[in-house]
Amino acid sequence: MKKNVIVGQSGGPTAVFNASLAGVYKTAKDMGADTIYGMRYGIQGLLEKKIVDLGEKIRNDMDVELLKRTPASFLGSCRYKLPEISEDKAIYEKIFAILEELEIMAFFYIGDNDSMDTIKKLSDYAETVGNPIRFIGVPKTIDNDLEGTDHTPGYGSAAKYIATVTKELVRDGLIYEMQSVTVIEIMGRNAGWLTGAAVLAKSEDCEGPDLIYLPEVAFDVDDFLKKVKKLVSEKQSIVIAVSEGIKTADGRYVCELSAPSDKTDSFGHVQLSGTGKYLSDLIIEKLGCKSRAIELSTLQRCAGHLTSRVDITEAYQVGGTAVKAAFEGKTGQMVILKRVSQDPYICTTDLYDVHKVANLEKKVPRSWITEEGDYVTAEMKNYIEPLIQAELTPIMITGQPRHIIIDDL
């Protein structure tokens, strides 16, 4: 049997998404894989037989290094949800027919919660029909909401970007004597890991954000305005960090208080946008002071110019661990990161049953949020800080970062 493997990327991109792909590719090559295929646009592309030989696209060690430092998704991504096996067996038969045609022995999928659901379903189907293909999930998400792992690759670099931008916005807000309130809207539907990273801006040379609101705690609009009013009476410039997904006590998204959104993605998730603007407009209307909303949006997930070396290193490692696990005969597993020491920071890789991960969501512990729900504690800051350490700058050509791309992508 040939030792051919295939890898795909799925879900929202990160600044280190491709570092995990590089880890899969290089380790598979070093372990003697015959052909390393890449799925274009994830499982959706596989169904359409959009497949490339990565050996023809990643030609040498310099290409591997470029891949590690290229943000977003080299192979392209998708948000495609596989049906339950009982609902559409034909789609699984089609996937496995394609994999068998390519003589695949191992299948790697780099992604988030929904991607781990794909690994779960494919490994379950393989077991049902007695197919020996091994399925391993490689964690990735800036949201940091995957169960079973200390943190996810992609989060550290996003946290570094958010902390840096917050610090710079605090500095920018102090340039005029005029009173101002800046509301920074940060990604995070149900989990506030990203927004919590704004606390890292609080340092010797920066007072950091004045208020931080996470979706784990119900948001009270009146209480918010009361606190902002008090801050306005005390300070020249106020900076507030809010998760896009904060909700009121009755379960309504704050961004929908002005106009409910009817837009959803392929997984049925409401598309959130406008939380910062709604609150900023409310401050102007109710308090009569200058305010602006800053929506970090996709910038926080594609900032390859400000990555964490720790994050890139770990992203590469989980890719390599996935390959080693498959070559050892493991299947139905997700690679995880285990923090074995806080100071000095030491993290190792391990495996975790994908059935305990798929479709679950890890939230910020309530004890890491202040009692009033308007800031995060030292425990959260200590948890995040090691993940943003050191830098791995892009390879620069004529003053611009050089990226590796697939010509026909």
Model region roles, listed by residue range:
Residues 4-7, 67-81, 140-150, 178-180, ...:
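Gly-rich Lys/Arg/Thr-decorated short loops/hinges at beta-loop-alpha junctions or inter-strand turns
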Residues 49-105, 114, 153-155, 167:
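Glycine-rich oxoanion-binding loops at beta->alpha junctions
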Residues 1-52:
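N-terminal phosphate-binding or glycine-rich loops at protein starts, especially the Walker A/P-loop
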Residues 10-12, 39-45, 79-80, 112-113, ...:
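Short, ordered loop/turn segments at secondary-structure junctions
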Residues 36, 98, 106-111, 117-132, ...:
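Accessory alpha-helical/coil subdomains and C-terminal extensions
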